Amino acid sequence: MHEEDTSVKYSVTAEVSESNDGGMLVGDYTILDELGHGSFGVVYMAKSRKTGEVYAIKEYNKANLRKRQQMGMMRGARGGMPMRPGRGGLFAARQMLLKQQGNEEDSDPFYLIKTELAISKKLKHPHIARLYEVLNDTKHDVLYLVIDLCNKGPVQELSSTDAKASPLSAEDTHKYFTHALLALEYLHEQGIIHRDIKPDNMLLTEDNVLKLTDFGESIMPEDGGHKVKGASGTPAFMAPELCQDASEITGEPADIWSLGVCLYGFVYGELPFKGSTVFDIIDSISAGEISYPGPYDEQLQNLLSRMMERNPDTRITISEIRGHPWVTQNGTFELPSKEINCQHIVDTITKEDVDNVLQPIFDIIPLINAFAKLRIIRRRIRDKHEAEQRAKDHDLPEDSEGNTKKQKEPEE
């Protein structure tokens, strides 16, 4: 859709309204259906009234962002898994680390969405959901992101460690894994670490194309390095090095581990690491014991064990995964070359990009408010002039402020 134009449009005065037939409008988009609920709002299917194209619109309720920031959670443990009482744990340590670093996330409730926008607006890949437009509804305190429609939803419903899902077919497992692999290779080639690879963030289009989404946890080190600080992501998909107290790790191997956990889920319909709390899951990951239920597939299990290798320094790389016999189907399947897959180069995303990504919206809000006040003043002046004119026409007296006095009704 619109491949010739890669720019992101900003609509600063979009509002939610009702259409003539009683439907819901968001700016120039007609809401067709509700696709699901995210951490910060609802995801809709919507149709452009200008082009007729159908998109997904991702809602960000600013109040929810502020509440999450005030609670100090900022995308910590997900899936409703309770923390053990009396332990600060991994995510408390993360918050302490972020505060020590003076991280923007601690003082700016829009930090997460600004990071996602700054990265998303520069990406162009067939297996990454593209951002087209940002809509700002100041009346309802909501931001909307217009993105590629992936109306078939997540590739697999495995949002919690005790969840069971239908295993994917061998054909779909291979297809969707290679789609995700190409997306991850593209990101890593641009120096972007996703940090939240999981089935929930792998969505399917109507044509069964997998698109990677959700860059709220992603980073792109300005110095071109590969080191990341602090734990991030969803516990069941975290690499073991993230479950330790290390303040700095290499980002790419952690993403590969997470993709390996996803592949395990595709094949077996469950996750390899389980627990009723975040800490139980971390203990399971740290123990490093992986069982392989179902029929034995030597090539597949070799790939899984190498992707979920505990040592990040010896974990399999993306280039090695490309040549793995399970991926190549023993030489009968060929991926697009790395040069073709990564041909759209991304400019380095700086802190300035993150800070200024919403500036087109924020800059114009004072101007909008000023125009609103000007309209009120003009209306008052117009009303006064009209009152003066009516007084002249009817020869009616005026009060001290120039308003027409009402004559007393004659007594009966």
What role is predicted for each listed range?
Residues 140-154:
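Conserved short submotifs of the Hanks-type protein kinase catalytic core
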Residues 1-23:
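Juxta-kinase regulatory segment immediately upstream of eukaryotic protein kinase catalytic domains
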Residues 310-314, 320-334:
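Terminal C-lobe "cap" of eukaryotic-type protein kinase domains
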Residues 176-177:
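Activation segment signature within eukaryotic-like protein kinase domains
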Residues 133-134:
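A short, aromatic-enriched beta-strand patch in the conserved N-lobe beta-sheet
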Residues 42:
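Conserved N-lobe ATP-binding subsite of Hanks-type protein kinase domains
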